[in-house]
Amino acid sequence: MKNILIRNYEETKEEILINYDKDSFSVSWQQNETWELSVTVPRTKGNQITFDLIDYENYVVFDGQQYSIKQMRSYASGSQIYKDIVATHIYYTIQDGRQYDTVSGTKSINDLLTHIFKAGNRGFSWEVVDPNNVFLKKEQENFGNDNYLNLINEILEDYGAVVIPNNKHLIFYPISEYGNITEQQIRYKYNTDEVSFDIDTYALKTQIKGYGKLKENANTDNLKDSDYVFPPVTYTSAESEKWGIRIQDPVEDERYTIQNNMLEYLKQQLHDYPDVSGSVTLKWALSLNKGDKVLFVYEPLSLSTYIQVVGITTYPAIPNKAPEIVLSNTKKTITSILANLARKGLM
């Protein structure tokens, strides 16, 4: 296993952590929500220097990623002294920056990220990976006047994005484009007995209409189909044979000047499947990474579909202990829904 390092706040001292409770050591990641490390450390003759280095705002470094100690509990059992720590990924220290200025108008995701970091980058860098030009410009009103983390979360919500930090370098992807289809599968009664998931069809739609670029002299006060460079195109999913016609909000995107290109885009945008989200505890370890798309087979409900890994809890010090996996094929995970409710004061 890779070493766990404890580093002081000034980053001038660093020690390897030994004699920690291996059962307690876990790393938990939830897409766009949390990434943290926790461990219990008893003080021993062999780790006294490192033990004393464990303190609030000092760092834990593991697997190339840096975490800031945000929670710590010191306690004793008889003569034995312990520290329980929770260290949050260094990305979340971005909340300490604030952009007071606001911007409004039609903005791209790059425009808004540039605006945030105009107030100072605080050691962070960023890039947007969008080779298929999925990100569209959005109308913004008074974007700003908040801390960096809240502003980034607003971007993730508005643009349908996911952020994957590599320490202080932030990579933004369209949520529909990131992650790899794997050969792994999670099958009920094969590699998991513990399955908890929800299925809902509130957002299921079977038809969508797309409008492309307007002609130069189009009358925008009374638009007609003939005002577009190609007639608006309608895509109807084969799922309509089962569920009937359920119409999704139309797409309006002036980037499109070719009808067939718009048709392909509509196929990507139509939400013609049930939303599935849940969690599983595996019987043994699988090699799964953030965003991987894994075949989930649940015979009792005849469910066989690719679902994305949106949360992983691993136990690196116990090689044979299986990870806990959170799966979802929705744009919003359960944790993000709860977080939104909390922000609105509804829970």
Positions of predicted regions on the chain:
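Surface-exposed cap/loop segments at beta↔alpha junctions
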Residues: 46-127
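Acidic, small/polar-enriched beta strand-loop surface segments
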Residues: 2-5, 180-319, 331-332, 343-347
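Oligomerization/assembly interface segments of phage tail-like spikes and tubes
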Residues: 27-45, 80-91, 210, 267-268, ...
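Short beta-strand and beta-hairpin "edge-sheet" elements
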Residues: 58-86, 164-166, 294-317, 322
